[in-house]
Amino acid sequence: MSRLYAIILIALVFNVIMTIMPDMKVEAVSCEDCPPHCATKDQRAKCENDKCVCEPK
């Protein structure tokens, strides 16, 4: 029975992590590729410390 609880707990933690990850603003996209990358998300492109940051319009 404890294995079942462990599996359910792992599934819940995985679900929370997968929900949070896409919301991260800084992504590993170079500044040259930033405008087209953010355009696919309908967001404004901005470069900070040589990293692409997509901000809401």
Curated annotation (Swiss-Prot):
Quoted from the entry, the domain comment is: Has the structural arrangement of an alpha-helix connected to a beta-sheet by disulfide bonds (CSalpha/beta).
Molecular functions (GO terms): ion channel inhibitor activity; potassium channel regulator activity; toxin activity
Q: Which cysteine pairs are joined by S-S bonds?
A: C31-C47, C34-C52, C38-C54
- Name of protein: Potassium channel toxin alpha-KTx 8.7
Q: Name one GO cellular component term.
A: extracellular region
Identify the InterPro entries for this entry: Scorpion_toxin-like_sf (IPR036574), Toxin_alpha-KTx_8/9 (IPR008911)
Report the coiled-coil segments.
none
Q: Which Pfam families match?
A: Toxin_6 (PF05453)
Natural source organism: Mesobuthus eupeus
Name the domain of life. Answer: Eukaryota
Q: In which tissues is it expressed?
A: Expressed by the venom gland.
SUPFAM superfamilies associated with the record: Scorpion toxin-like (SSF57095)
Q: Which UniProt keywords apply?
A: Disulfide bond, Ion channel impairing toxin, Potassium channel impairing toxin, Secreted, Signal, Toxin, Voltage-gated potassium channel impairing toxin
Give the range the annotation lists for the signal sequence.
Answer: 1-28
